[in-house]
Amino acid sequence: IGDYIQTKAVIDLVGSKNIKILDRENLDKYNDNVIKTIINGWFMESPENWPPSEKIKPLFISFHLNPSIEAELLKDESLQYFKSHEPIGCRDIYTRDILLEKGINAFYSSCVTTTIDRNNYLKSKTQAKGIIVIGAFDRLKPTLDYKSSFKLLLSLLKYPFKKIDYSLKLLKFNRHLKNQDFKIKRYNQLTKKPIKSHNEGLKLATEMLQKIAENEVMITSRIHAALPALAMGLKVVFIDQGLDHGNHKHRLSGLTNYFTCVNLKDFFMINLDNIPEMDKHKVHKKKIKDTINK
């Protein structure tokens, strides 16, 4: 749902009239009328489809270049494309720095989800209460590695032990939350089935944002749960355990300065009644709004 939360943040800024949602993975195939397009978010699973069509007039804001396809998106043709549409607003420090190294005028814009307005999603005027937990353990859940027969066998051998470790940590986490003087609500940003349409995705994103707006504390390991919560004024605890891979570290660079960021061991030491409020994101929030609405 995270991609659609980012999309919803942009729609909230530009308005819902006369908008068109384009497929991020097929921007090169767009062949309709010339269209102004805000290009933000994670790029991309299909780098062979980059750069976009000439009929797309891009505004880059909150753009993330994923390290797994970095070589493809930094080829000469792509660099010329970035150069012709400078400056490039980057969601993270990593993306900004890699583009600057290539001579592209780039700046750190932060993420569009930091602009989300709580008032747009509160169903009632009652005071927000309770803790919302979204995917706090998503990164710790053991999985099987299907990349090769050897890796699959190795992951199968390790799986039972990782599963036991995961279950024990989850049990301790749940017991800790039960002892808190808060009502606890739990949700998941990962859908059980693929999202079939943009309308469905936006509906799910809206419902998730409404759930976030009702609470006062967020506990998560999902960046697009943490940032909207921050924007809405919630106190945020971000569990970074399991996010050691370079892909995760790069996409989080700069963003984790916005909230209380801990590993699981340190989480149990936190007083959830006394989490500091953070406002480091606000300077970038204003710049995003000004850039999109200019």
Task: Cite the ranges covered by each PLM segment.
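Active-site anion-handling motifs in enzyme catalytic cores
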Residues: 1-294
